Amino acid sequence: MLPKNPIIGLCQQASFLISAAKVDQCPEDSGLEVAFAGRSNAGKSSALNTLTHASLARTSKTPGRTQLLNFFRLDDERRLVDLPGYGYAKVPIPLKQHWQKHLEAYLGSRESLCGLVLMMDIRHPLTEFDRMMLDWSVASGMPLHILLTKADKLAFGAAKNALLKVRQEIRKQWGEGISIQLFSAPKRMGVEEAQMVLAGWLDLLPQEDEESAEEA
């Protein structure tokens, strides 16, 4: 049984901080930030809301609705960041290019960024966007944790097989340092496991618990 996670209390008092269209509009680059990324329609906003027990991120039936860097305050030193969704076919190409430019600027310059949570639809994993984020994570040494979202859409055995297959592919191409798990927002599957990863990155766990979270 996992110990009570200190991030839960912080999330209960989480609040919207600011939206930024580009890097120079972001909050002061201090403290610790964890960013959430995912291709449009991968369930990113639903996952963020479920992990924080709050309706922080805007959800919509239209993928790509989140077009800004959205910052949420946990306390004076810790933030969560909802990054723009990418890849939705109906989004105009110039807007897609704007998103990519400023996402790359954020990822490349943000000193407070301490971890990246990447959402992949379990039925359509390892898209071009996902591979780009994996490449960047390995090249930059940024800790990355993958949520295979919408795991409830598959039978349990099929979901486990998908997890094993994706894990093997990631280890083959990107090495052993990337963690991955099943996740379902409606069923709250994998919530505690993901919260432990967040707490470790945000320096909220005793050393021994942090090491356990990293091994998950």
Swiss-Prot record:
Domain EngB-type G residue range list: 30-204
A Pfam entry, by short name: MMR_HSR1
Keywords: Cell cycle, Cell division, GTP-binding, Magnesium, Metal-binding, Nucleotide-binding, Septation
Binding site for GTP: 38-45, 64-68, 82-85, 149-152, 182-185
GO molecular function: GTP binding; metal ion binding
UniProt-listed GO biological process terms: division septum assembly
Required cofactor names: Mg(2+)
Amino acids binding Mg(2+): 45, 66
Gene3D superfamilies reported in the protein's UniProt record: P-loop containing nucleotide triphosphate hydrolases
GO cellular component terms given for this protein: cytosol
Entry keyword annotation includes Membrane: no
Similarity comment text for this entry: Belongs to the TRAFAC class TrmE-Era-EngA-EngB-Septin-like GTPase superfamily. EngB GTPase family.
Annotated function: Necessary for normal cell division and for the maintenance of normal septation.
Protein's name in the database: Probable GTP-binding protein EngB
